[in-house]
Structure formats: structure tokens, C-alpha cells
């Protein structure tokens, strides 16, 4: 009986102490399940328990991989 009371007290008091590390992940670990999305987040799916899967919005622009290196010797013209 003492063990039961001890475990109950531990789980009861640790339940509110959850942080973002223990949040349920969604969208292949890029998103997080929460009740509402932040300003810079976008709703992309629904999680269990009526939660929303929110992903941080990426800024528009060119990726570094898309830019051509001028020193690479690559020319678009023939000859």
C-alpha cells in the first residue's frame, strides 16, 4: 500500500512538470503537437487528443545549395 501511495504521489506531482522535450512529435519530428500554433507556425495536421501539429514556417528565399559556384568551372554555353 505504501508503494502505491508513493507511486501515485510521484506521478501526480510530475504530471504538470512536463516540458517541450516530452511533447508528442509529429510530421517526422519537424513538428510538435499542441493546443494552438504560435505566430510563426503553420497548422499542417491533427494529432491525437484534438491537438494541432504545428511546424515553424520557413522563410522564402534561395537555398545555399541552389546557388552555382562561379569558381566551379561550370559554363552553361557550349564552346
UniProtKB/Swiss-Prot annotation:
Keywords: Antibiotic, Antimicrobial, Defensin, Disulfide bond, Secreted, Signal. This is Beta-defensin 15. Disulfide bonds join 26-53, 33-47, 37-54. It is found in: Secreted. Pfam families: Defensin_beta_2 (PF13841). InterPro entries: Beta_defensin_dom (IPR025933). GO terms for biological process: defense response to bacterium; innate immune response. GO terms for cellular component: membrane; microvesicle; nucleus. Residues 1-20 form the signal peptide. Has antibacterial activity.
